[in-house]
């Protein structure tokens, strides 16, 4: 996975990616068998961890990181 700013994404992809304010955020989620390992690796790479892994009442482990533009990214275990 790569986390890029809008500027670097423009440079890498040559797409017309508009400037927006930090208030225009969204959440995207990625499912993994080992949330803790993903969060450990993200932390080692300097990624902002905004929610440590927690087991939710329904049994799913969920954590949150933020990309350089402040978008929330959910890292979660599969729903059983």
UniProtKB/Swiss-Prot annotation:
Residues 1-78 form the VOC domain. InterPro entries: Glyas_Bleomycin-R_OHBP_Dase, Glyoxalase-like_dom, VOC. Pfam families: Glyoxalase_2 (PF12681). This is Uncharacterized protein YsfE. The lineage of its organism: Bacteria, Bacillati, Bacillota, Bacilli, Bacillales.
């Amino acid at each position: 996975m790569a986390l890029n700013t809008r500027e670097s994404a423009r440079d890498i992809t040559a797409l017309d990616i508009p400037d927006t304010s930090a208030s225009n955020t969204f959440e995207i989620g990625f499912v993994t068998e080992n949330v803790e390992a993903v969060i450990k690796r993200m932390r080692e790479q300097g990624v902002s961890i905004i929610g440590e892994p927690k087991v939710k009442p329904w049994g799913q482990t969920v954590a949150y990181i933020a990309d350089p533009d402040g978008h929330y990214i959910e890292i979660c275990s599969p729903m059983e």
